[in-house]
Amino acid sequence: MTPFRRPTVLGTSASAPFPPAEAALTDPDGLLAVGGDLSPQRLLNAYAHGIFPWYSEGQPILWWSPDPRMVFRTDGVRLSSRFKRQLRASTWTVRADTAFEQVIDACAASPRPGQDGTWITAEMQQAYIALHRLGHAHSIEVFDGARLVGGIYGVAIGRMFFGESMFSGESGGSKVALAALAANLHGRGWPLIDAQVENPHLLSLGAERLPRADFLHQVQRQVALTEPPGSWSARYGEHAASGLCETRLT
């Protein structure tokens, strides 16, 4: 009989190490630890070791590292030919780090596929806003004039981007945000976007299943590369979303 296993209970010290990601449970897949806090130090430590928080209102903080891991190659986001035709005719523009709080608010109001409510609690929103103010969390925003119609946010360490959530205020807004993020990162030599857990929508956009061991190897390599934190706004500027049709996206 297989011994019953429980996730590790984290202490209150933000500097306390996580257990190895390989120690995560298989049922539920990837649950590694419970407790702790969402301080910037603990969050950055988690991501740098292939671990992320995911829990609902009323639950303790749950930390995960599933196997396999969903990722996007930054040159592998798929936009359909039909969508590209629509995009060529659009007047949407794309920016970075100019509306982070609006993006995370909109993501919190948009449940993940298969879920009735949001997993982005008020506590989580404040934690990622704090990371953004420190230059570690970033958003890509899609605008129709002055109106936000799509976005994605996540955490950057070294040359690894850990996607957290995205939303569409209008059809296709999240696709444009993801494609813009991927194109920008690919141009800067960043190979992967962490997409965390599998769902059909991500697969339709080109996400791949990566064995956890391979994912952790990539994380270890990429987070060790020097990439100073800070706002992406000036570096990214503002671009016409239609220009994504001319990138190397498949």
Swiss-Prot record:
Region span, Disordered: 1-21
Keywords: Acyltransferase, Cytoplasm, Transferase
Reactions this protein catalyses: N-terminal L-lysyl-[protein] + L-leucyl-tRNA(Leu) = N-terminal L-leucyl-L-lysyl-[protein] + tRNA(Leu) + H(+); N-terminal L-arginyl-[protein] + L-leucyl-tRNA(Leu) = N-terminal L-leucyl-L-arginyl-[protein] + tRNA(Leu) + H(+); L-phenylalanyl-tRNA(Phe) + an N-terminal L-alpha-aminoacyl-[protein] = an N-terminal L-phenylalanyl-L-alpha-aminoacyl-[protein] + tRNA(Phe)
GO biological process: protein catabolic process
Record keyword Transferase present: yes
Keyword Ligase attached: no
Subcellular location: Cytoplasm
GO cellular component terms listed in the entry, alphabetical order: cytoplasm
SUPFAM superfamilies to which the protein is assigned, alphabetical: Acyl-CoA N-acyltransferases (Nat)
Recorded superkingdom: Bacteria
Record-listed E.C. numbers: 2.3.2.6
Any one Gene Ontology molecular-function term assigned to this protein's record: leucyl-tRNA--protein transferase activity
Role noted for this protein: Functions in the N-end rule pathway of protein degradation where it conjugates Leu, Phe and, less efficiently, Met from aminoacyl-tRNAs to the N-termini of proteins containing an N-terminal arginine or lysine.
Family: Belongs to the L/F-transferase family.
HAMAP family, sorted: Leu_Phe_trans (MF_00688)
Protein name: Leucyl/phenylalanyl-tRNA--protein transferase
GN (gene name): aat
